[in-house]
A protein has these predicted regions:
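SAM-dependent transferase fold signal centered on methyltransferase-like domains
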Residues: 1-212
Length: 212
């Protein structure tokens, strides 16, 4: 879009920013013609298909970042890809390998961003998933740590209903987090129960008046 590119260039100039070069080109042609080495490539594929239809699979986005990734990796040590908030986490590891880091960012109870950090080094650390609640903190879980077969047994009565942050639910980390803090997880993406209120729960805490 030449108009948007021109507007961005003018805005950078008005702000006194001189270290940004605006290039209006297709991602495929730019990567092919780029002769340097970048510290990082940030890709935000357009998630609109024919007829302005929303798409979620990377193969349907523009550019097709999965097909373009080998060429990008030749030009940078690190690639960060922005995905749809609806994008499946397991699919990210299937497409980009088991050494990626997936950040799931929420704000005010809504999943806002899914960011996939793809390293180029073959000896990069094992992959991980990070749940980030804007303004509240983050939790990191290694991809290969394994999920506990179950958390603590269901033994009512409980004193508190714990509602995990949506980023934990999206990452399917509720049971692993429950095992970490010693509470009972009803499901992989649902709520938890605890006899005592955790000191710092990654979500919301409600007292239970009575359990039938």
């Amino acid at each position: 879009d030449p108009v948007t590119a021109r507007v961005a260039a003018v805005n950078f100039s008005l702000l006194g920013i001189s270290n940004i070069e605006v290039v209006n080109d297709s991602a495929e042609h730019f990567i092919e013609s780029f002769s340097g080495t970048a510290d990082l490539v940030y890709a935000d594929p357009a998630r609109r298909g024919e007829g302005n239809r929303k798409v979620f699979r990377f193969e349907e986005c523009s550019p097709d970042i999965v097909s373009l990734l080998p060429a990008i990796r030749e030009k940078t040590r690190r690639v960060v890809v922005k995905a749809s908030p609806l994008f499946d986490i397991d699919e990210a590891f299937r497409l980009f390998g088991d050494r990626i880091t997936v950040d799931i960012v929420s704000r005010q109870g809504e999943c806002k961003e899914v960011l996939i950090d793809v390293p180029s080094a073959p000896d990069a650390p094992a992959g991980s998933v990070r749940a980030v609640a804007a303004g509240c903190g983050s939790l990191v879980f290694g991809r290969g740590d394994g999920e506990p077969a179950q958390t603590s047994d269901f033994e009512p009565p409980y004193g508190y209903l714990l509602v995990p942050d949506v980023s934990l639910c999206k990452a399917r980390l509720v049971r692993r987090y429950a095992a970490r803090i010693g509470c009972y997880a009803v499901s992989q993406s649902g709520y938890c129960l605890s006899r005592q209120a955790p000191d710092r729960f990654f979500g919301r805490v409600y007292p239970i008046r009575e359990m039938a």
